[in-house]
């Protein structure tokens, strides 16, 4: 099946991949991304593990209807999640190309 040197090379490659993955996950966790809605009237900042760090609401909205404000906050949060997801996908694509993974390898892993 595998020669000893082939197995050793495979294990070294797997170890290197694991180290790079852990480093990337640490970098992603430190990221902060802003999501916006209502033309910037509501802003939500989340980190790379989707924890909400900050919510900013323009004072002009405080007199408006509660339902609309809730919708804008939800939309801003979802925008931030979309942005962080794109960043993660880009980083995984970059990592996979540097590791020479097989063509078509799927990085959609639940732990990312």
Swiss-Prot record:
GO terms for molecular function: DNA binding. Keywords: Cytoplasm, DNA-binding. The keyword Heme does not apply. HAMAP family: DNA_YbaB_EbfC. Binds to DNA and alters its conformation. May be involved in regulation of gene expression, nucleoid organization and DNA protection. It is found in: Cytoplasm, Nucleoid. Gene3D superfamilies: Nucleoid-associated protein YbaB-like domain. Transmembrane segments: none annotated. This is Nucleoid-associated protein BCI_0116. One of its GO terms (cellular component) is cytosol. Belongs to the YbaB/EbfC family. Homodimer. It comes from Baumannia cicadellinicola subsp. Homalodisca coagulata.
């Amino acid at each position: 099946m595998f020669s000893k040197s082939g197995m050793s090379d495979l294990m070294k490659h797997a170890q290197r991949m694991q180290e790079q993955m852990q480093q990337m996950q640490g970098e992603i966790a430190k990221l902060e991304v802003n999501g916006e809605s209502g033309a910037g009237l509501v802003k939500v900042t989340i980190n790379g593990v989707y924890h909400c760090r900050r919510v900013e609401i323009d004072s002009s909205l405080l007199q408006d209807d509660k339902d609309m404000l809730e919708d804008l906050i939800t939309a801003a949060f979802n925008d931030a999640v979309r942005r962080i997801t794109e960043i993660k996908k880009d980083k995984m694509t970059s990592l996979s190309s540097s590791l020479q993974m097989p063509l078509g390898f799927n990085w959609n892993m639940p732990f990312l």
